Design a protein with these regions (language model features):
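C-terminal effector-binding regulatory domain of bacterial HTH transcription factors
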Residues: 1-20, 136, 261-273, 281-334
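Short helix-boundary/capping micro-motifs
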Residues: 31-49
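Alpha-helical linker/hinge and terminal dimerization helices associated
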Residues: 63-64, 85-107
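Central regulatory/effector-binding core of bacterial HTH transcription factors
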Residues: 111-171, 325
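Flexible hinge/capping segments at coil-to-helix
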Residues: 173-211
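Secondary-structure junction motif
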Residues: 194-196, 209-231, 298-309, 313-324
Length: 334
């Protein structure tokens, strides 16, 4: 409720000084009675009950200790004091309206424009709700999605303000804040007979081609590094930049893939044709970080991180638990 004090330039109007705050809504009700020719019409114009309008005007008269409306006449008209109040009240309400508009405009100008970069697995899983969560903090937001190397270069080059990336070293000078650590897992065609409970990549590659993520991406590099560590790298047959291409091939039974639980949620349109299985050997994980340019306020960066962590936590307890239950115990959010 907006309240304010109104002073008057005549001594005879009130028996005592005006000490009470005047409700701006009561002023609007009073003016509506004058403008619409009665309590009932004013109530209709304001979307209130006639009783509410009558009580508002009565409170205003009590606050000022003066009659504002001549209720004997039909339609009711303002008394001399009411006419004086009406003239000043219109100016006051107009000033308040201008002030509110100015404050809203100033608030919009104070909020930043934000350019946000998201790796595909994040954009496709929590991207939209993340933007919704921070919408009140920004005046304008633009989102780029892509692979970590590209996003890192764009952050370093000043073309992005915030990125969610799986390789913080690609944006040197920006302190990373971890959002997620998740294990690599295997995805197999549901149509594959005699599916193993744990996948040995070398043996599985002897049964089906490995559908790779491109080494242009960080996830592709990480998977390739783990295959080299295992001592034998499967032959290159299929390679894609993104999860959709990888999962489409596996769903058709053309191969199998190494991926992560979040990528599995990203490619959930293929979930009915895929099975997630743990990989053999030590657990190998990837990490996802938030990196912010120096021009981004600490408060905004913290809000983005908190929102992302909350959304990722919900994904783990929901989709990931359903699609890759064996992976959940190896996942750390935040």
């Amino acid at each position: 409720m907006i309240v304010g004090k109104i002073g008057f330039g005549w001594a005879s109007m009130a028996k005592s000084p005006v000490d009470d705050d005047i409700d701006m809504r009561a002023l609007k009700a009073f003016l509506a009675v004058l403008d619409n020719g009665g309590m009932a019409a004013a109530a209709g114009a304001l979307g209130l009950t006639q009783s509410a309008v009558s009580q508002a005007v009565a409170r205003l008269e009590k606050s000022l200790d003066v009659d504002l409306i001549d209720r004997v006449r039909r339609p009711p008209v303002a008394t001399a004091a009411g006419e004086a109040l009406a003239e000043r009240a219109r100016r006051v309400l107009a000033d308040f309206s201008d002030l509110a508009d100015g404050l809203r405009h100033a608030g919009n100008q104070a909020r930043p424009r934000v350019r946000l970069g998201l790796i595909d697995s994040v954009a496709g899983t929590i991207g939209a709700p993340l933007i919704r969560a921070i919408r009140a903090d920004v005046r304008e937001v633009s989102v780029w999605s892509g692979i970590s190397p590209t996003l890192g270069r764009d952050l370093a080059g000043g073309r992005l303000d915030l990125i969610v990336s799986s390789n913080p070293s690609m944006a040197a000078g920006h302190k990373p804040k971890r959002l997620l650590r998740e294990p690599f897992i295997a995805v197999l065609p549901k149509s594959l007979r005699h599916r193993p409970d744990i996948v040995d990549p070398i043996r599985m590659a002897e049964r089906l081609p490995l559908v790779r993520y491109s080494v242009r991406s960080v996830i592709g590099e990480d998977i390739e590094r783990d295959l080299v560590r295992r001592g034998r790298v499967p032959p290159r047959v299929f390679e894609f930049d993104g999860t959709d291409g990888v999962f489409a091939m596996v769903a058709e039974g053309l191969g199998w893939a190494v991926t992560t639980p979040l990528c599995l949620v990203h490619g959930r349109m293929y979930a009915d044709d895929l099975v997630a299985v743990p990989l053999s050997g030590p657990v190998v994980s990837r990490e996802i970080f938030l990196l912010a340019a120096n021009v981004v306020g600490a408060g905004l960066a913290a809000n983005v991180r908190h929102a992302a962590i909350a959304l990722l936590t919900a994904r783990v307890s929901g989709d990931i638990t359903r699609l890759a239950p064996d992976a959940v115990r190896h996942i750390r959010v935040g």
